[in-house]
Amino acid sequence: MSIFRKKKGAEGEYLACRFLKKQGYVILQKNYRKKYGEIDIIAQEGGDLVFVEVKTRSNSDWGSPVAAVTKQKQRKIIRVAQTYLAETELFDEAIRFDVIGIILDENSPPIFELIHNAFELEKFNGIF
């Protein structure tokens, strides 16, 4: 991954945290990594533990950033989330998976698209 893309991604994650805080989320952890994947943001919102994937783009020429969260990426996020739940012993928490897309065009303010419950754990049960 190029330095430009890493920098753009880090900027997107920073802006996503600010945006989510304004929406009432409490950020618990950023960049939770395991050898098989990463969760960008883990937060609490209402009574839910929320695993958030952040996708940042320079423009929408290739479509919405949230559309880049493929089924394969969803599986990785779910696998990492299951590890997080096991490590923290938060098995009884209500959880959900949100995706936030950010368009960072240098000529205009950032555009945010937040999708609550973007995908569900039940759809992938038994695949690991």
From Swiss-Prot:
Which cysteine residues pair off into disulfide bonds?
A: none
Q: Which NCBIfam families match?
A: PRK12497.1-3, PRK12497.3-3, YraN family protein
Superkingdom of source: Bacteria
Could you say which protein family the record assigns here?
A: Belongs to the UPF0102 family.
Its organism's taxonomic lineage begins at: Bacteria, Pseudomonadati, Thermodesulfobacteriota, Desulfobulbia, Desulfobulbales
Q: What is this protein called?
A: UPF0102 protein DP2807
Fetch the InterPro entries from UniProt. Restrct_endonuc-II-like, tRNA_endonuc-like_dom_sf, UPF0102_YraN-like
One Pfam family this sequence matches:
UPF0102
Q: Which GO terms describe its molecular function?
A: nucleic acid binding
